[in-house]
Amino acid sequence: SPPSQDFMRF
């Protein structure tokens, strides 16, 4: 699964 901070990189 991707990092928890990566999903807010949009």
Swiss-Prot record:
Subcellular location: Secreted
Keywords linked to the UniProt accession: Amidation, Neuropeptide, Secreted
Any GO BP annotation: neuropeptide signaling pathway
Sequence intervals crossing the membrane: none
Lineage: superkingdom: Eukaryota
CC annotations in GO: extracellular region
Keyword flag Secreted: yes
Keyword Cell cycle attributed: no
Modified-residue entries (Phenylalanine amide), positions: F10
Family designation: Belongs to the FARP (FMRFamide related peptide) family.
Protein name per UniProt: FMRFamide-3
